[in-house]
Amino acid sequence: MSTTQFSSESRGQYKAEAYAAAGAKSPLAPTTIPRRDPGEYDVQIEILFCGICHSDLHQVRNEWSSGGVPTVYPCVPGHEIVGRVTKVGSAVTRFKPGDIAAVGCLVDSDGNCHECQAGLEQFCPHMTLTYNSPDMHLGGVTYGGYSDSIVVKEHFVLHVPPNLNLAEAAPLLCAGITTYSPMRHWSVTKGKKVGVVGLGGLGHMAVKFAHALGAHVVVFTTSPNKKEDALRLGADEVVISRNTDQMSKHVGSFDFILDAVSAEHDINAYIQLLRRDGNIILVGAPEKPHAVSALGLLFKRRNLSGSLIGGIAETQEMLDFCGKHNITADVEVIPIQRVNEAYERLSNADVKYRFSIDMASLKSQ
């Protein structure tokens, strides 16, 4: 990986069509944004599909400002990007025009810190997010995938297996890697007992990955009507988490639990389900901090951890794994003109299980 040379110097640019929010209470609306002309190490991509992540909703509504991540407007969201390469820089070696390519949550990092050298660019202190992050090339902030095109350094561009449906592949760039990475890090393999808390955008991907890895998969949900879908996605068992009898049958038996719930809930009930040295991993982020009983961790040396997306090499590994096992997200494809309706439905958990925007609709305005 070449070291990034951060620069805010003026360079050639072009105008791209996009949808942006002008403020926290403003609907997303058509606009034009600047994109840099492809440089020596850059790949220009015509965006074909972009998934809608719940973090897009939080960011657009400035709901993370209290956590130190204020939104800069106009905000163009989108970090689940799949498209077709249109131009490449002279030093680009892994892509050519016409290739199908993808971009996830990161578009840059410093390239030489300990985290980058370990392939963990998501933890780089100077990493650049795909949107609402300082743009070291044009100034201002980065703009995401609710747009007709994007220009990204080659290192952060990914190959998409040819057998995957592109609309369904887009959410893999966030929901996919967010759930795949902790399973790989904590060695989810055949024979392990794995719990998935919550069957939403993240949870449904976690079920698919855990099943493909050969684990015995148990889904925890508050909704009995999700049982049939959980089994269809690959779960071996479904537990209604409000049913204390069902929960008590699993005490001390799990190797690994992935908690994908962002709503407030009692995490101690799930900690008790771990065996000795078992791991519960948080990928959901409730607004209020969890109240954790130390004794639940101490007496069986249980571990509570968090996980944030994944590095670039691991994200490519995840996409290749999806190609091998024919794994994609369950999506509802929408035109960009329905994005505000999709946001309202997402806030009411009214989607199975991700929205994917057909960006061809942007051209029909």
Model segments located where?
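N-terminal Rossmann-fold NAD(P) dinucleotide-binding loop
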Residues: 203-204
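Adenosine-nucleotide cofactor-binding segment
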Residues: 190-199, 209-269
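NAD(P)H dinucleotide-binding glycine-rich loop of Rossmann-like/cofactor-binding domains
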Residues: 109-197
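Rossmann-fold NAD(P)-binding glycine/threonine-rich loop
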Residues: 284-301, 312-320
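Helix-to-beta-strand junctions that scaffold the AdoMet/dcAdoMet cofactor pocket
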Residues: 274-276
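Glycine-rich beta-strand-centered segment in the early N-terminal region that forms part
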Residues: 34-50, 64-117, 122, 161-164
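C-terminal hydrophobic helical "lid"/dimerization subdomain
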Residues: 2-14, 312-365
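Short glycine-centered segments of the SAM/dcSAM-binding site in methyltransferase folds
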Residues: 100, 193, 278-279, 303
